[in-house]
Each structure stands twice: as C-alpha cells, then as structure tokens.
Design a protein with these regions (language model features):
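C-terminal substrate-binding subdomain of Rossmann-fold SDR/epimerase-dehydratase oxidoreductases
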Residues: 185, 190-336
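A conserved pocket-lining segment of Rossmann-fold NAD(P)-dependent short-chain dehydrogenase/reductase
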Residues: 79, 157-167, 174-200, 222
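N-terminal Rossmann NAD(P)H-binding glycine-rich loop of SDR-like oxidoreductase domains
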Residues: 5-23
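NAD(P)H-binding glycine-rich loop region in Rossmannoid oxidoreductase-like domains
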Residues: 51-89
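Conserved Rossmann-fold NAD(P)-dependent oxidoreductase catalytic core, especially the SDR/UDP-sugar
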Residues: 69, 95-132, 152
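Rossmann-fold cofactor-recognition segment
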Residues: 43-53
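Glycine-rich NAD(P)-binding loop of the Rossmann-fold in SDR/ketoreductase-type enzymes
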Residues: 52, 81, 85-96, 127, ...
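Conserved beta-loop-beta element that borders a ligand/cofactor-binding pocket
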Residues: 109-110, 141-164
Length: 336
C-alpha cells in the first residue's frame, strides 16, 4: 500500500481517480484549492490548499510515497487569459516539485503538444505546441525528465464523459459539448471537421494511473483509446442520441490542432486497455441532460474559460459584483 497525494484531486479527473486509488488499497490524501467546487464531499482526507503555497504543501509531500500531480490551469483559452499566472501554476510548481519531492511522480501532460501533423505520432514524434497550454505542458515534461527521469508522464488524449457523481463535469470538451448542443439546442456547428483528435474516456485516466502508483515504469506515454475526426464524432453523437442537426462551417477556426496519436507503447509496455468508450461518454452526458442534471449550457461552471475569467481577469468584472477569489489567483492575477 502506498500513501498517495493527489494534488488538484477535486476536479474532473481527480474524482474517479481518487475512488479507484482507494479501491486499490492505497491511502489517499487530496490537496486542492476548490477553485471550481464549494466543498469536498468524498470520504478521504482532504486539505484545502494552493499549489503556489509551497510552505503549506511541503509537509504533505513529506507524507506521500507517490504524488499524482493533476493541478493545472487546463485548456487553451483558459490559459491564454493570463500567461503569467499560467506559467507559475503549470510550469514553476513542477520545477519546485522535482527539487523538493523524492518519491514517485506521476504527471498528466497532453497530446496537444503534437499540434498539427498529418502523421500517426508516437512518443518520439515531432512536437509542435500551438498554444500556451501545450507549451507549458511540454516545458513541464522537460523539467521532469531532466530533474526526475524516474517519473511517469502520460500525454492525455482529449477527454470525454463523466467521472464520478460528485465532481464538476467539463462541458467544454468536444464530445461533451456536442452532446449538450445536440440535446439542448438541436444544432451542432462543426468548423472544418476533418481535423483529427485522439480521444479517451475520463475514467480511463485512472485505469492507466492506478496500477502504476507503486510501480517503477518511467518515461513518456501517449494515453488514449481512438482517433477520429470532429465531423465523424458529431455524426456519431447525432445518431446515438437521436437529436441535433450538423452544420459544417468552412471558415478558419482558431483551434488549428490536427493530429493522430499511436497508443501502442502504453498498451505493450504498461498493459493499458481502455475500459470505456466514446460511445459510453456520449450516453453518460445524454443521460445527465435527459434527467435534468444539465439544463443551462450557458452556466460558467461547465467551462474552464468562463469559470476562470473572474479570477484571472479581475479587471473585467463589473463594479459592485463580488466574487470568491482563491488567494493564489487573486494574489498573482495582475497585468497580463
């Protein structure tokens, strides 16, 4: 049994990961700022804390055998709101972790580091990050591999579906967003559509990580289940949920990522096999909508960009409006 500190463990990935880590017999402690949540409801030890508060975080590193570092500002638009804060959270904290913690490090990166490429890319493929988010993840990878080459890094495909029943669901991810638009609006705009994305059910992040908590595998692994075009994903959604019309828009779109990724290494070396599918993700999100759990797609809570804007761009908040501003972001949010 290992003592596992899940940093940033109260979010979209962390909920299901925490459950599966406990089920595997490990002792779990979650450290999280609760940026997107009002309270933590799971029955594991929880510490409310900021990843930029190194003095507060340090004793919990001393306790842990393994750290799963989920804490990050995630997504291209959200990270672009305030590059300075993004770098502090997504890169500088990783440098500090590698210099401070002597145990096992498991770090989720992103397949977005590949950018735009027509080839099927393995872990040795050329990287071409097209956003601040991807640049930061690639730099964090470099820091880890330089300082702690015994660590394990997973480059995650685009996630989809529902994790656990407690944690906030992200509806700004392509599958979840298109299902929501099909069910609530009946109209799916697809810009271009021929661009490829690697896909992975959010629960399968835990499928990959949990067996490696007390293992010794190291290096960088692509983690995903399939590659498909945005247009094909939209067509699957319309057919599966029985709602929505697709509009193909042949105009330039700000997201120029286009890449197909090989998952052979993670299967061959770590024995990873996905337990969930994109169709499972479609069904889960459709069920939430059908049962009234998701009604208003304009709510900021569903989007990292809209949730983070009040904290990263405080000058844009109308006068007289009070916001709950976590101290890490209020302290560091300033000129961009």
């Amino acid at each position: 049994m290992a003592r596992v500190l899940v940093v940033g463990g109260a979010g979209y990935i962390g909920g299901w990961l925490t459950d599966k880590t406990v089920e595997a017999g490990h002792e779990v402690r979650v450290y999280d700022l609760l940026l997107y949540e009002e309270r933590y409801l799971k029955g594991v030890e929880f510490v409310a804390g900021d990843v930029l508060d190194f003095e507060r975080l340090h004793p919990h590193l001393d306790w842990a055998d393994t750290v799963v570092w989920l804490a990050a500002l995630v997504g291209d638009p959200a990270c672009a709101l305030n590059p300075g804060v993004t770098r502090k959270i997504n890169v500088d904290t990783i440098d500090w972790l590698c210099r401070t913690f002597e145990g096992r490090i498991i770090f989720p990166s992103t397949c977005s580091v590949y950018g735009a490429n027509d080839e099927l890319l393995d872990e040795n493929g050329a990287t071409e990050p097209l956003s601040l988010y991807a640049e930061g993840k690639l730099e964090a990878e470099s820091v880890i591999m330089r300082r702690r080459p015994d660590s394990l890094i997973f480059r995650l495909a685009t996630l989809a579906g529902v994790g656990d029943s407690y944690s906030r669901i992200r509806m700004d991810l392509v599958v979840n967003l298109l299902v929501m638009r099909a069910k609530l609006v009946g109209h799916l705009q697809v810009f271009g559509g021929e661009q490829y994305r690697p896909m992975l059910h959010v629960r399968d992040v835990a499928t990959a990580i949990v067996p490696q908590i007390d293992g010794d595998a190291s290096g960088i692994f692509n983690l995903g289940a399939e590659n498909d075009t945005i247009a094909a994903i939209a067509e699957r959604i319309v057919e599966r949920v029985g709602a929505g019309e697709i509009e193909r828009v042949d105009v330039p779109f700000q997201d120029t990522r286009n890449y197909k990724v090989s998952f052979d290494r993670v299967e061959q070396e770590l024995g990873f096999k996905p337990e969930f599918t994109v169709d499972d993700a479609i069904d889960q999100v459709a069920w939430l909508i059908d049962n009234g759990r998701v009604k208003d797609m304009s709510l900021a809570t569903f989007s990292n960009l809209h949730s983070l804007r009040p904290y990263l761009c405080p000058e844009e908040i109308p006068l007289g409006r009070e916001i709950r501003r976590p101290h890490s972001l209020s302290r560091h949010a300033g000129p961009r």
